[in-house]
C-alpha cells in the first residue's frame, strides 16, 4: 500500500510555509509593540476645572514637540512651521472670544454685585449697552466698534473696580491679559504669540492625548476635562497609568466653582484629591502634585484684599514649616500661603498613606515655560522610578 500521509501538494506546502512566516512576523511585531508599550510613560492629568491642566499640555508641546502644530511629528522644519502658523491662525478666534467673554462678564456683573459697582464715567453707559447687546450674538464678527467700546470700558475705573472683585463671580483667568492687549488683538495681521496661546482658555471636553519624547523616552500625556460632569470619563484612562499629575489652582482659595456657584474651588480640589488618593484602582499609582497658578496666588496674597483665613480659618494658626524653600526675593507672606496649601494636600496623602504610593508636591506657574521645564525635569526621575516599579523592575 502507498503512504497517504504525505499527500500535500507543493502549493499547500508553500502556503503553509508562507503562513508560518506571516505568523512569525506578526508575533515579532506584537513583541515589539509590547516592548514599546511597556517602555512608554503614561501620565494622567487630573484636577478640578480651570486648574491649568490643558496649559501644562501646551507647555509639553512647546518644550518637547514642534510647538503649536497639529501632530507634532513633522521632520521637515518648513512643514512644521507651516502647520504651526496654521494652528495659530485658528486660535485667533478663540482668543477674540476670550476677550469678548471677559468684558461681557465684567460689565454684566457690575449691577449684580452686592453692593453694585457704578461706572466712573457715566457717559460710558452706551458702551455697556452695546457690549450687553452683542452678548449672545452667534458668529460675532468683531467690528472695529467692539474693540473701541471694550477698550474705553476697560480704562473706566468703575469697570476696573468690578474686575478687582472677580472672585465674587465667574471670570476667566486670562481676562486682564487679553483686555490689556486689545490694541494688538484687533489688528488684521494679528498672529498670537506662544504666551497668548498658553493664556487662551478653551473648555476641555473629552480626553486628549499628547505624545512626546524626552531623551529617547516616550511619554503619553492624557488631559481630561475637570468639570464635574467630565469626571465620569476619568476611569477610562486609569489602565496602565505610570503616574498621575494632579493640578491645583492655588489662587482659587477665595473662588467658587462654576458648576454650583457655592462650593469653594480650593476645597473642591482637596475633596477631589482625596477621592483620587483613596480610589481602590489607584492605590499603587503615585501622584505628582502641581500646585499651580503661583503667580496669581502671590498677587492675591500681596494685595491683601482676600485673606486665606476668611476661607480656611486654620490658616490663622499656621506657621511656615522649617522645610520651606522660598523663591529668591519671595515675600514671607507668599511663602506661608503656598506652603499652607501644600500641607493641606499632604495631610490627606499622609493620613491614608500605606507605602504603596506617594505624593510629590511642586509649585508651578503653567504659563511660565521655564518653570514648567524645570519642574518636569525634576519629575522625570520620579516618573522613571514609578515606571520601573510598575513593571516590577525595581
UniProtKB/Swiss-Prot annotation:
One of its GO terms (molecular function) is D1 dopamine receptor binding. Residues 364-369 are annotated as: G5 motif. Residues 8-23 have a biased composition (Basic and acidic residues). Residues 42-55 are annotated as: G1 motif. Keywords: Cell membrane, GTP-binding, Hydrolase, Isopeptide bond, Lipoprotein, Magnesium, Membrane, Metal-binding, Nucleotide-binding, Palmitate, Phosphoprotein, Transducer, Ubl conjugation. Disulfide bonds: none annotated. The keyword Cell membrane applies. Residues 288-295 are annotated as: G4 motif. The modification Phosphoserine is found at residue 352. CDD domains: G-alpha (cd00066). Residues 219-228 are annotated as: G3 motif. There is a cross-link at residue 300 (Glycyl lysine isopeptide (Lys-Gly) (interchain with G-Cter in ubiquitin)). SUPFAM superfamilies: P-loop containing nucleoside triphosphate hydrolases (SSF52540), Transducin (alpha subunit), insertion domain (SSF47895). It holds the Pfam family G-alpha. One of its GO terms (cellular component) is cytoplasm. GTP binds at residues 47-55, 197-204, 223-227, 292-295, 366. It is a lipid-anchor. Its EC number is 3.6.5.-. Heterotrimeric G proteins are composed of 3 units; alpha, beta and gamma. The alpha chain contains the guanine nucleotide binding site. Component of the TAS2R14-GNAS2 complex, consisting of TAS2R14, GNAS2, GNB1 and GNG2; within the complex interacts with TAS2R14; this complex plays a role in the perception of bitterness. Interacts with CRY1; the interaction may block GPCR-mediated regulation of cAMP concentrations. Interacts with ADCY6 and stimulates its adenylyl cyclase activity. Interacts with ADCY2 and ADCY5. Stimulates the ADCY5 adenylyl cyclase activity. Guanine nucleotide-binding proteins (G proteins) function as transducers in numerous signaling pathways controlled by G protein-coupled receptors (GPCRs). The alpha chain contains the guanine nucleotide binding site and alternates between an active, GTP-bound state and an inactive, GDP-bound state. Signaling by an activated GPCR promotes GDP release and GTP binding. The alpha subunit has a low GTPase activity that converts bound GTP to GDP, thereby terminating the signal. Both GDP release and GTP hydrolysis are modulated by numerous regulatory proteins. Belongs to the G-alpha family. G(s) subfamily. This is Guanine nucleotide-binding protein G(s) subunit alpha isoforms short. It comes from Bos taurus (Bovine).
